């Protein structure tokens, strides 16, 4: 259903420049949007496309040229784009109840407007808030607790006693609360250390597909409020991840590491165990983090160090073979000069 630009602007907290009664019913890119759609400019390098877009309206930052188009000005066009996708395309879930083929254990407490699909398995003593959706193949072990507005996609597993907060989404194939990797050597074999702790996902966490978060050995592995974790991430036992972190695909964080708030880790970062990473740290892709990082640092490399220094060092790497030849030539020349000086001394 379409909305006027006035309605859209009110929803976004922006202002209309142009025809506030123009109607839009969807979004598109600057290149592909047409009549009846709205587009946005988030990257200044595409500003010239505003003049040629066929969209009915453009979302722009304050002061950006509109080239005669209908404009909605907002402080953050990219955030506005995300909100409009929700407005136009994300339908509120419809409560389906417990469908045939779902398995529900004894003593399960369920809130209102639940949807549990065929093939889901809810064990004894599970507690769920309102508007929880469990897709086929979801398995909740005994004693799991889910808040309200939780969505667990197909084949998610939540192990015993783990706790998930409100408005949490976990995507297909992820395991929450698998055993931590803990073994004690006895001089001959490895003795498994029972992992009796849990995992806690706080409110507004989202976790991608095929990620694994290990349960703590004794207490809790914690993922802080608002943190987003990409596909194929491994977080080991006893870790504490702060609030509003962004952890990209294939990151591995070793056990008992503490990560602060608003930390960003690029793809394939490896983090050692038993270290601390401060607030607002950014770690570049493929970095190896062997030790503590103070707050507000940007690091990259293997081992990770200051990002600017890493850029300088990495610019030298491709020329190392050439520099090695030059160094060998200089060493040879120095040796020749030293031998000549010795010969001259003997002559004197």
UniProtKB/Swiss-Prot annotation:
Catalyzes the N-acylation of UDP-3-O-acylglucosamine using 3-hydroxyacyl-ACP as the acyl donor. Is involved in the biosynthesis of lipid A, a phosphorylated glycolipid that anchors the lipopolysaccharide to the outer membrane of the cell. The keyword Lipid metabolism applies. The gene is lpxD. Belongs to the transferase hexapeptide repeat family. LpxD subfamily. GO terms for cellular component: membrane. InterPro entries: Hexapep, LpxD, Trimer_LpxA-like_sf, UDP_GlcNAc_AcTrfase_non-rep. Homotrimer. PANTHER family: UDP-3-O-ACYLGLUCOSAMINE N-ACYLTRANSFERASE, UDP-3-O-ACYLGLUCOSAMINE N-ACYLTRANSFERASE 1, MITOCHONDRIAL-RELATED. It is an enzyme of class 2 (transferase). It catalyses: a UDP-3-O-[(3R)-3-hydroxyacyl]-alpha-D-glucosamine + a (3R)-hydroxyacyl-[ACP] = a UDP-2-N,3-O-bis[(3R)-3-hydroxyacyl]-alpha-D-glucosamine + holo-[ACP] + H(+). This is UDP-3-O-acylglucosamine N-acyltransferase. Pathway: Bacterial outer membrane biogenesis; LPS lipid A biosynthesis. Its EC number is 2.3.1.191.
């Amino acid at each position: 259903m379409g909305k006027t630009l006035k309605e859209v602007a009110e929803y976004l907290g922006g202002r209309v420049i142009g025809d506030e009664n123009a109607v839009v019913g969807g979004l598109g890119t600057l290149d592909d949007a047409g009549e009846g759609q709205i587009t946005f400019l988030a990257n200044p390098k595409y500003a010239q496309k505003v003049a040629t877009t066929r969209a009915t309206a453009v979302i722009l930052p304050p002061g950006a040229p509109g080239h005669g188009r209908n404009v909605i000005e907002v402080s953050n066009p990219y955030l506005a784009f995300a909100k409009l996708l929700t407005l136009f395309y994300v339908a509120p879930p419809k409560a389906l109840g417990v469908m045939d083929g779902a398995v529900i254990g004894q003593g399960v407490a369920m809130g209102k407007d639940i949807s549990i699909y065929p093939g889901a398995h809810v064990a004894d003593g599970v507690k769920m808030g309102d508007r929880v959706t469990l897709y086929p193949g979801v398995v909740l072990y005994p004693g799991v607790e889910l808040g309200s507005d939780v969505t667990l996609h197909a084949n998610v597993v939540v192990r015993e006693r783990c706790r998930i907060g409100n408005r949490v989404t976990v995507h297909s194939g992820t395991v929450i609360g698998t055993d931590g990797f803990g073994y004690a050597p006895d001089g001959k074999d490895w003795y498994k250390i029972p992992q009796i702790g849990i995992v806690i996902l706080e409110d507004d966490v989202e976790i991608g597909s095929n990620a694994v978060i290990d349960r703590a050995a004794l207490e809790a592995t914690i993922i802080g409020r608002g943190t987003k974790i990409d596909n194929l991430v491994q977080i080991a036992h006893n870790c504490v991840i702060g609030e509003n972190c962004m952890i990209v695909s294939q990151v591995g964080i070793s056990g008992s590491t503490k990560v602060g708030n608003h930390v960003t880790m690029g793809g394939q970062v490896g983090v050692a165990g038993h270290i601390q990473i401060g607030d607002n740290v950014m770690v570049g892709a493929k970095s190896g983090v062997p030790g503590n990082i103070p707050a507000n640092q940007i690091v990259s490399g293997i081992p990770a160090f200051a990002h600017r220094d890493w850029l300088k060092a990495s610019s030298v790497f491709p020329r190392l073979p050439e520099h090695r030849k030059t160094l060998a030539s200089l060493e040879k020349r120095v040796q020749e000069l030293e031998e000549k000086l010795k010969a001259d001394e003997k002559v004197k």
